[in-house]
């Protein structure tokens, strides 16, 4: 029973607790936070660290700045803008923010900058990853920023930067990742970053700098001590320098030096005057072969990796207290290390940080206990190689305590090349010929430099070392390395370069041959074409002359035959007229009694005359038709002959119809005088008057002759009652003529006066007596 009571009480307590919690959560304060937001929201902007004085915006323009001023106020100190929406920026739009100290513009398309309003509080200006190209605009802006200290213009498109104004407090300038090849900066600078540009020299770089970054430039020459001293420089970054020798530096306060990835073959610490150097980085120096001098005693971090070094100077790492050596970070790696105990004396201070135990199987005690008074290691070094006509250094792997003096000799011919004293760091060329001085040079550290190796320098070289314990020597063999001739760099490989050159020569010769063949073919084709066209022109002229001659001959024959027919016709008509006139005269003297008989007889005579005249006319017309048809057949035959020969000539000589047409036009072109002369001849032959009227009866100038019936038919003639011959018309029973004559006034009158005897009745003579009814 008690258990049941306790169970019921527990259930009631749980129900009460749940109900009270629901009541609390259902209150308005449980759903709404009535406190004001610390940072108001503007579309595209946010507060950095919930501060209204540090605003970051994305993809905005000038209109959004007014909204920012209204929402966040005018007390903004840092404004960061990403993706500015215009290609121009006028800094006057920031005038409503009098406390603005930092302006950062990133990832925009800015091309132009301007402004006139002075911003007295601005200290930092950064315009990165834009498209600025004019340094003069930037230099003008410095005048409106009197307190500016830092300016960043990285990732733009400057090809030169010229701004050496003195009225500025600018201390930090970042010009990295541009295209700058010429540089002029203010003398007030203390930090300069010109990495990843196109600088080829160190002109106009201030020596008052404390930090300098000149990495990834095309520097081929390093300035000397006299031209380049940095009394205040503390950090220098010269990564990926395109230098092989000549690196030197005078910076007494330098703490950090970085020359990673440089092309240095030789490094002389006697010329690197950095007594306070703490960090030295020389990683990935794949061409480094020799080192001279020693590190400063203050160095704490050293790195030499991926080099071609075979040893280091015995005193390269300074011997100091054990505690100091434990703090030094030393990173050294090479694939050609000489495992000689005396040549490994340099590793004693940093033995624990090297891989000598692994690579050479030597302990520190073994190296330290070795007796190294004097000696030269030459037998284990092998042949030393150098590239053709590229400066190459031959190392003398010597040792001794104290450091021995090194002398170089050429084995054959036996000539002295020079000497080096490591204690005084002096190089001597005593008793050395001028020829040897031109070819060889003694470097600091005792290595022999061959200035421009060729086959004459392939020889044995003797390195003689000497100190208070005696003298020793070693012979080193030098050979030329032709591996570069087969490298994959086409422009630096003899093999691939020769192959590419041969291909280019073959290609050029091929193109020249093709050009010569095409030129020759074109010239021959042009000559053959000229000859062919000349032959065609001559043949066309000959054919045209032949055609014209034949056509003239046909025309003359046709004219003669028509003239013969016409003369025959006139003769017959004249004979009939004479016969008719003589018969008429016989009957004119008869008296009135015989008038009727005479008239009937005259009518019979007239009918006979007309019949004979019709037969003569019909014969002449048929003969003219035959002549015309024969003439047309001969003309068509001549045209067909000319056309066939023309087509044959076009196919044989491969000429176009257009060219032949031009030739024919030039040959057939005759002057108007010749045409008029021909028309006059035709008019004279056909007896056509010059004042021939037109169809409508108006008198105009004589037009050119056209084909008419006079060419193909005979003229009509009749004899009137008086016995005179006059033009007449063709009787209705006459056969049709090929071409009808044009009607004229005279022909119409003749047609009206001429009629058949049967229809008009008897024609009376004016002398005959009147007829009796």
Curated annotation (Swiss-Prot):
Comp. bias regions, Basic and acidic residues: 764-773
Topology, Cytoplasmic side: 515-773
SMART domains: LRR_SD22
InterPro entries (alphabetical): Ig-like_dom, Ig-like_dom_sf, Ig-like_fold, Leu-rich_rpt, LRR_dom_sf
UniProt key word Nucleus: no
Transmembrane segments: 494-514
Keyword tags: Disulfide bond, Glycoprotein, Immunoglobulin domain, Leucine-rich repeat, Membrane, Repeat, Signal, Transmembrane, Transmembrane helix
Signal peptide: 1-20
LRR repeat extents: 52-73, 74-96, 97-120, 122-144, 145-167, 168-191, 206-230, 233-251, 252-275, 296-319
Keyword tRNA processing attributed: no
Source organism superkingdom: Eukaryota
Topological relation to the membrane, as annotated: Single-pass type I membrane protein
Limits of the Ig-like domain: 349-479
Annotated glycan sites: 114, 204, 361, 379
GO cellular component, one term: membrane
Bias-annotated ranges (Low complexity): 746-763
Disulfide cysteine pairs (residue numbers): 396-463
Main subcellular location of this protein, as a coarse class: membrane
Region (Disordered): 725-773
Protein known as: Immunoglobulin domain and leucine-rich repeat-containing protein 2
Organism of derivation: Caenorhabditis elegans
């Amino acid at each position: 029973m008690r258990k049941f009571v306790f169970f019921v009480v527990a259930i009631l307590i749980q129900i009460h607790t749940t109900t009270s919690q629901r009541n609390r959560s259902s209150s308005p304060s449980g759903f709404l936070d009535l406190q004001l937001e610390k940072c108001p929201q503007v579309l595209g902007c946010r507060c950095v660290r919930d501060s209204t004085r540090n605003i970051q915006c994305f993809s905005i323009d000038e209109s959004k700045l007014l909204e920012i001023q209204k929402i966040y106020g005018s007390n903004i100190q840092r404004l960061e803008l990403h993706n500015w929406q215009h290609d121009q920026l006028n800094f006057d739009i920031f005038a409503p923010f009098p406390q603005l100290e930092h302006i950062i513009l990133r990832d925009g398309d800015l091309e132009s900058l301007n402004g006139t309003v002075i911003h007295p509080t601005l200290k930092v200006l950064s315009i990165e990853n834009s498209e600025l190209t004019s340094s003069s605009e930037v230099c003008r802006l410095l005048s409106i920023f009197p307190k500016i200290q830092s300016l960043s213009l990285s990732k733009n498109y400057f090809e030169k930067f010229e701004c050496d104004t003195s009225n500025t407090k600018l201390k930090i300038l970042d010009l990295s990742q541009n295209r700058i090849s010429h540089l002029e900066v203010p003398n007030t600078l203390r930090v300069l970053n010109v990495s990843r540009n196109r600088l080829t020299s160190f002109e106009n770089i201030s020596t008052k700098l404390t930090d300098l970054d000149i990495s990834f430039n095309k520097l081929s020459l390093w300035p000397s001590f006299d031209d380049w001293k940095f009394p205040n420089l503390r950090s220098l970054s010269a990564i990926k320098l395109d230098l092989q020798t000549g690196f030197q530096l005078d910076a007494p306060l330098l703490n950090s030096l970085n020359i990673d990835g440089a092309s240095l073959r030789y490094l002389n610490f006697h010329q690197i005057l950095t007594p306070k150097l703490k960090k030295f980085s020389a990683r990935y120096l794949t061409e480094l072969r020799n080192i001279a001098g020693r590190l400063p005693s203050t160095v704490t971090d050293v790195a030499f990796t991926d080099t071609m070094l075979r040893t280091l100077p015995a005193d390269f790492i300074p011997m100091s207290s054990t505690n100091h050596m434990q703090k030094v970070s030393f990173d050294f790696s090479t694939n050609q290390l000489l495992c000689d105990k005396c040549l490994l004396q340099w590793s004693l201070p940093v033995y624990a940080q090297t891989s000598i135990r692994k690579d050479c199987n030597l302990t520190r005690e073994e190296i330290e206990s070795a007796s190294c008074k004097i000696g030269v290691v030459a037998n284990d070094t092998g042949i030393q190689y150098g590239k053709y006509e590229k400066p190459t250094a031959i190392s003398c792997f010597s040792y001794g305590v104290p450091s021995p003096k090194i002398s170089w000799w050429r084995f054959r011919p036996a000539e002295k090349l020079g000497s080096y004293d490591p204690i005084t760091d002096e190089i001597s060329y005593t008793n050395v010929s001028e020829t040897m001085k031109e070819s060889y040079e003694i470097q600091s550290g005792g290595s022999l430099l061959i200035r421009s190796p060729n086959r004459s320098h392939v020889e044995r070289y003797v390195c003689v070392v000497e100190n208070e314990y005696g003298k020793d020597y070693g012979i080193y063999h030098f050979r030329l390395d032709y591996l570069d001739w087969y490298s994959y760099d086409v422009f630096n490989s003899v093999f691939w370069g020769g192959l590419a050159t041969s291909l280019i020569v073959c290609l050029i010769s091929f193109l020249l041959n093709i050009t010569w063949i095409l030129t020759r073919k074109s010239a021959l084709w042009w000559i053959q074409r000229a000859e062919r066209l000349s032959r065609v022109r001559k043949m066309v002229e000959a054919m045209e002359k032949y055609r014209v001659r034949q056509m003239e001959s046909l025309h003359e024959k046709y004219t003669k035959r028509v003239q013969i027919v016409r003369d025959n016709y006139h003769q017959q008509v004249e004979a009939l007229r004479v016969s008719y006139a003589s018969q008429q005269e016989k009957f004119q003297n008869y008296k009135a009694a015989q008038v009727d008989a005479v008239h009937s007889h005259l009518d019979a005579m007239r009918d006979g005359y007309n019949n004979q005249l019709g037969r003569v006319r019909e014969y002449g017309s048929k003969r003219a038709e035959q002549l015309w048809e024969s003439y047309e057949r001969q003309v068509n035959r001549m045209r067909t002959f000319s056309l066939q020969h023309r087509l044959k000539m076009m196919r044989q000589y491969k000429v176009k119809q257009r060219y032949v047409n031009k030739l024919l036009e030039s040959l057939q072109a005759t002057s108007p005088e010749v045409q008029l002369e021909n028309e006059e001849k035709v008019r004279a032959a056909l007896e056509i008057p010059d004042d021939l009227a037109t169809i409508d009866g108006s008198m105009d100038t004589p037009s050119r002759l056209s084909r008419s019936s006079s060419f193909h038919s005979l003229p009509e003639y009749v004899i009137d009652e008086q016995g005179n011959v006059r033009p007449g018309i063709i009787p209705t029973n006459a056969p049709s003529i090929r071409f009808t004559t044009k009607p004229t006034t005279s022909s119409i009158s003749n047609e009206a006066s001429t009629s058949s005897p049967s229809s008009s009745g008897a024609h009376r003579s004016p002398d005959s007596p009147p007829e009796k009814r």
